[in-house]
């Protein structure tokens, strides 16, 4: 046991270069083994662990992944029939064409909010002092007309 510990202690410093911690394979079991393709003959070698993308390595089919021709359509039909069922909430009901993103204005929504009549502007005289409200140019024109 102590020899083994000495060997491990040596390995990090100047010890045998194949036991250095920087070598690629960490465990001695891997150092001595030949690659698996050489152990077995070419006849015995597996083709590939996953021959097609829908089979997993231990050879069980994954039924949710395989695409049998009717399956996706069956799901769609199920979903649609749920959408068309009479008791379904209305958000699942199918509309023939998608609604436009910007709502087109309805007839009833033409009113403008505010207490003014359409076509007349709101009286804003109380915002201004009387000197701001009188128009000197109009006064000059009126004087010119009277002359």
UniProtKB/Swiss-Prot annotation:
Residues 20-36, 45-57, 74-88 have a biased composition (Polar residues). Keywords: Developmental protein. InterPro entries: TTDN1/SICKLE. It comes from Xenopus laevis. The keyword Repeat does not apply. Residues 1-119 are annotated as: Disordered. This is Gastrula-specific protein 17. The keyword Transmembrane helix does not apply.
């Amino acid at each position: 046991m102590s020899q083994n510990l000495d060997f491990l202690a040596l390995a990090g410093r100047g010890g045998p270069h194949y036991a250095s911690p920087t070598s690629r394979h960490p465990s001695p079991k891997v150092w001595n083994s030949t690659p698996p393709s050489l152990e077995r003959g070419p006849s015995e070698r597996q083709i590939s662990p996953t021959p097609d993308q829908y089979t997993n390595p231990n050879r069980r089919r994954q039924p949710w992944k395989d695409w049998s021709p009717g399956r996706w359509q069956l799901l769609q039909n199920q979903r649609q029939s749920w959408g068309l069922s009479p008791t379904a909430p209305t958000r699942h009901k199918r509309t023939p064409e998608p609604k436009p993103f910007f709502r087109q204005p309805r007839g009833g929504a033409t009113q403008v909010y505010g207490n003014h009549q359409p076509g007349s502007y709101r009286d804003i005289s109380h915002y201004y002092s009387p000197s701001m409200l009188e128009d000197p140019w109009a006064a000059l024109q009126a004087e010119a007309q009277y002359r």
